[in-house]
Amino acid sequence: MKKIMIDGEQLTLQDIIHVTRNFYEIELSEDAKNRVRNNRKVVDRYVEEEKVVYGITTGFGKFSDVVISKSETEALQRNLIISHACGVGNPLEEDVVRGIMLLRANALSKGYSGIRLETLSTLIEMLNKGVHPVIPEKGSLGASGDLAPLSHMVLVLIGEGEAIYQGKRMSGREAMEAAGIRPVVLTSKEGLALINGTQVMTAIGALTVYDAINLSKISDIAAALTIEAQRGIVTAFDKRVHEVRPHAGQISCAENLNRLLEGSTYTTKQGEIKVQDAYTLRCIPQIHGASKDAIQYVENKINIEINSATDNPLIFSEDNDVISGGNFHGQPMALSFDFLGIALAEIANVSERRIERLVNPQLSGLPAFLTEKGGLNSGFMITQYSAAALVSENKVLAHPASVDSIPSSANQEDHVSMGTIAARKAREIYKNAVNVVAIELMAAAQGIDFYEGYTLGEGTQIAYDTIRNKVSKLQEDRVMYFDINQCANLIFSGELIEAVEKAVELQ
């Protein structure tokens, strides 16, 4: 079994994918183990000396002024977890749950949270053995961290709650017993250390960003196919145009289009048939490129967050100091994930408009709705309806969650981020966008089939062949949702991008 070493400093987005989807195991580095041990000594000293320190010898939130005795330490930590496990809704997907466990373990391995090494090791053992807590998707305010969903994770760690183990849903205690893992009895600071962080929103967001990077490339592929089906003008993608407005995403998109369309005889030059195309063709680098830049921005923020200490209070063992701060606040990620959702919504917006250009005979010069016997057959008519519905839904979802805040804990926690809502929305927008782009891929391939005697580009030929391997040309009306699902799966699975990138490097 392949392993990834974690130390709170060097985790990457690709590491997250390996652990969440390829089931790599994780292991603590020796340096991380030493940091955790040394950090814990400070907590033990404060408890022994009965110093009043938030989260170690006090209650939580509004109860931060209530002092807790040494004899009540274990009860305090247990009560924290069981009282905070108030999530509702459907369980989060397996890859998200694995991401949450990984990111929390990595944050704790930095050695600022005061957790015992054996407790952290048990969380890692759960991940490695595939004990996946059932974590409801809703209930987090995104400050003080993802308290409710992370509490559901910790329930299983202490032998409570529910988990999925080897494909079966069972009680947390049953899952731990079946996996041969001894549940933990939490002691001072540990409950708070485990649930006070942004790992739920960040896990959802990290997976979505990874997928969004691939979707941004596939949207370039879909656009290139549409350009060919429309006999579009490639002069607009001349690198000189983009070098004088040097946004990185714009330049990358123009380069992608040029590489994909290299050798195509479907495409035209400026003035050959017409002077210029509509914006949804001519401005693809500017539109797609802006989304690429936004996705890159969010990826950069994620790379910081996945290697950050997001607990409160933080324990600085070298200075023998404990400081209450606000690193649990999800605002940096909330704004980022709202931005991500907007970027993905725009990918779908422009894709749907290109679908309209393909199915509308007044715009395309192709048979109406891409069918030869219009009237008897409806062809691609309703696929555009579906795309329009998804795009409209995305416009609602793209409203930022981070502009909202509802005070909690008797106004002690009087500003919250709603970052987990932002991450969940971005994930839903991504799924909708995939289906819109899938419809464009199908429609563009259908449009191309009405031409004879032309050659596709180096990249678009591979894309076309991959699509046609799953979805045949529409000769007469058939049940289309099967085709949409097949084409969407080419995107979700990575099959399409892998096939194209074997021949054409995309950015």
Swiss-Prot record:
Domain of life according to the entry: Bacteria
Q: What is one cellular component GO term in this UniProt entry?
A: cytoplasm
| 2,3-didehydroalanine (Ser) sites (modified residues) | 144
Q: Which UniProt keywords apply?
A: Cytoplasm, Histidine metabolism, Lyase
The post-translation modification note in this UniProt entry reads:
Contains an active site 4-methylidene-imidazol-5-one (MIO), which is formed autocatalytically by cyclization and dehydration of residues Ala-Ser-Gly.
Residue intervals passing through the bilayer? none
Main EC class of this protein? lyase
Q: What InterPro entries does UniProt report for this protein, alphabetically? A: Aromatic_Lyase, Fumarase/histidase_N, HutH, L-Aspartase-like, Phe/His_NH3-lyase_AS
- UniProt-annotated location(s): Cytoplasm
**Entry's EC annotation:** 4.3.1.3
Q: Tell me the residues linked by 5-imidazolinone (Ala-Gly).
A: 143-145
Q: Which reaction does it catalyse?
A: L-histidine = trans-urocanate + NH4(+)
Name of this protein = Histidine ammonia-lyase
Q: Sorted alphabetically, which CDD domains does this protein's record hold?
A: PAL-HAL
Family, as annotated: Belongs to the PAL/histidase family.
GO terms for biological process?
A: L-histidine catabolic process to glutamate and formamide; L-histidine catabolic process to glutamate and formate
Gene name for this UniProt entry: hutH
Starting at the broadest rank, the lineage of the source organism is:
Bacteria, Bacillati, Bacillota, Clostridia, Peptostreptococcales
